[in-house]
Curated annotation (Swiss-Prot):
The UniProt record lists the keyword Transferase: yes
Substrates-to-products reaction catalysed: a 2-demethylmenaquinol + S-adenosyl-L-methionine = a menaquinol + S-adenosyl-L-homocysteine + H(+)
A GO biological-process term: methylation
NCBIfam families, alphabetized: MenG_heptapren, MenG_MenH_UbiE, PRK00216.1-4, PRK00216.1-5
Functional pathway: Quinol/quinone metabolism; menaquinone biosynthesis; menaquinol from 1,4-dihydroxy-2-naphthoate: step 2/2
Binding residues for S-adenosyl-L-methionine: T58, D79, N106, A107
EC number of the protein: 2.1.1.163
Name of the protein in question: Demethylmenaquinone methyltransferase
CDD domains for the chain: AdoMet_MTases
Primary role: Methyltransferase required for the conversion of demethylmenaquinol (DMKH2) to menaquinol (MKH2).
Record family assignment: Belongs to the class I-like SAM-binding methyltransferase superfamily. MenG/UbiE family.
UniProt lineage: Bacteria, Bacillati, Bacillota, Bacilli, Bacillales
Length: 237
């Protein structure tokens, strides 16, 4: 029986959890840290805020949010991979971040009331969900009016020449890195597949609008290999 996308993605992340952080740095040449740092600067997270990190994985962005909201804030991290969460929980415990709660859950059915969070983020996770629009609408539902929904994700470079290099890298070299560094050629082949079919920047910006967000900001990184999309929930619906 053929696996659904959700089942396949779950299997991938359960298998690569112990090498995920190392591989993130290898395949992005450490750039993912700078992308997240700049995204956080644009977000301008206020101390004492409530934030939700969807598809939080090993909790790197969750931890950055916790540092930004401070001890009087609150951060939830949600992921459907227990193994990824286990890695994240060890990090959170080591840092003593009592304002963080990591939980097992599904991005398609966020277990929160409407208008709960000031910020809702998803980092390198939207491309792996079964329905992009459904998850964006769920994120919009649980953010407060005036709150921000933010996606940091791989994208499709538009610069001629560089786009071809990017495609070759993702299709052939990244899975090879997965085999060398994580013994996971098949799993990293899936990650390049999910990245190659993900909407480009303009299309994702339209999806943010269709999800009910306004004042959309788009910030490309490293010639467009990744991009931040930020939208604000209207004050009155």
């Amino acid at each position: 029986m053929q696996q659904s996308k959700e089942e396949r993605v779950h299997d991938v992340f359960e298998k690569i959890s112990d090498k995920y952080d190392v591989m993130n740095s290898v395949i992005s040449f450490q750039r993912h840290k700078a992308w997240r740092k700049e995204t956080m600067r644009i977000m301008d997270v206020k101390p004492g805020s409530k934030a939700l990190d969807v598809c939080c994985g090993t909790a790197d962005w969750t931890i950055a949010l916790a540092n930004a909201v401070g001890p009087n804030g609150e951060v939830k991290g949600l992921d459907f991979s227990e193994n990824m969460l286990a890695v994240g929980k060890e990090k959170v415990k080591a840092l003593g971040l009592e304002q963080v709660e990591l939980m097992h859950g599904n991005a398609m059915e966020l277990p929160f009331e409407d208008h709960t969070f000031d910020y809702v983020t998803i980092g390198f996770g939207l491309r792996n969900v079964p329905d992009y629009m459904h998850v964006l609408k769920e994120m919009t539902r649980v953010v407060k009016p005036g709150g921000k929904v933010i996606c940091l994700e791989t994208s499709q470079p538009t610069m001629i020449g560089f786009r071809q290099i990017y495609i070759l890298y993702f299709k052939y070299i990244m899975p090879l890195f997965g085999k060398i560094f994580a013994k996971s050629y098949k799993e990293y082949s899936w990650l390049q597949e999910s990245a190659s079919t993900f909407p480009g920047m303009k299309e994702l910006a339209r999806m943010f609008e269709d999800a009910g967000l306004e004042r959309i900001q788009v910030k490309p990184f490293t010639f467009g290999v990744a991009a931040m999309h930020l939208g604000v929930k209207p004050e009155s619906e």
